Amino acid sequence: MPEKLDSSIVLLRERIEQGMRGSADLILDEFELAGVKGLAFMFDGLVSNTQVSDFLLRPINRIDPPEADPEKLWEYLRSQFLFSSEQGIVETYEDLFTKAMSGFAMVMLDGVPRALSLGYQGFETRGVGEPAMEKNLRGSREGFTESNNTNTAMVRRRLKSPNLTVETLYLGRQSRTNVRLCYLSDVAAPETVEAVRQKLREASLPLVLDSGFLQAFIGKGAASLFSGTGTTQRPDTLCAKLAEGRVGVMVDGSPNVMIAPYLFTEHFHTLDDYTQRPYFTAFVRLLRMAAFFLTVLLPGYYVAVVTFHPERIPRMLLPAFLGSVSATPLSAMGEALALFLLYELLREAGLRLPDAIGHTLSVVGGIVIGDAIVTAGLVGLPMIIIIALTAVSAFAVPSLYEPVTILRFLFIFIGGILGLYGMVLGFLVLVVNLCSLHTLGTPLTAPIAPWQPRTLRDLFWRSGWQRLGQEDYNVSSARQRERGQTDDQDT
């Protein structure tokens, strides 16, 4: 049970000072109104000094209260004298500290076991800019920032519907992070919203600094390569998902908004698909899907063929392929693993360094090291070509980079040990695993499994807006269809 606020200003001040342990940024200002002592509690750097001075300290010094009773005086301050766009009443110490650390000024009077919270936030935030990871050719250039207030406003500006609901939770035992749930109450399934809300409340974490901290609690855990949740840094993308019955999860301090549930096929869709011509959209989507299978299977297939099935190599390429393998000290599997580990090492180093140095390291390191190992005869040219083609294909679907990287290594091992038969078996296991995954009751592979023919108009290709706009798609239909199939089987 949360501890209630004391009515004594002396006890309140002692409790605050004890809880903050003499923090240098703690501000405690005492004042007196009609013989009643008061206390203002805030943190330097989190509140706007101008707003605190103009709307709190100066008005309190000029006030001539008609009543000396603490309860009536507190109500007078709350309703007629102290104003803020974000004003609330706090009754527990937990909420008192949480509000103060979120940029609120807290006002308390002796004899009143409540505090008035005034939203005078003044901390610095990053301005709205274009997302770095989700570039588009047409449409908005706005991206989410680290402020939940700004992010909510960008969504509200695009979805001018009274059904757009925003709920606030405070998660993290130490961080008490402001987490917001966004959904359309007339579109999202109530059981989906309740499931997300419950899973977030059950998330027992000391810190919540990004939406990635919460993904494992809503989607699949670490044991699964694929997650049933997605992320976006674009408000227009989030609005499109909310209109399909999804739930958005915003974490204060992070520009990455989580979307749940998220289907596997959506990784191959972008916002530009809906602004381009349908025939070009179909071409690009099929290209992304081909790139996914290419980056996962091509290295393992090459290793399996040159190791166990050289008869499948075209006759004109046979001398080059087998000659490169026999001329190098490593096996085909060893070559592939060594080169991919080197590639991941260069990529990781380039990501962690400043942009100018990171780009130079990636380009120069790749060229110099690649040329050196080929000249030294450590690897063959065919393997270099396979690695380059695979790496480029991986960037066509950036949201799947993590599972793709692990799957690529797994298929290299399978191809190098079991050959093509092992590759086929491994691919079947991958498909079965994908079809068995669910998030919030929605199959990850919907609308392919379970099969929903009417959604094909926006799956591998996109129909024109004349047809696409005739019926709204709702992600809960996949769950309802699967339930119907299960009921039929039980019957």
Please place each PLM-identified region on the residue numbering:
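Membrane-embedded alpha-helical signal segments
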Residues: 1-297, 301, 315, 435-491
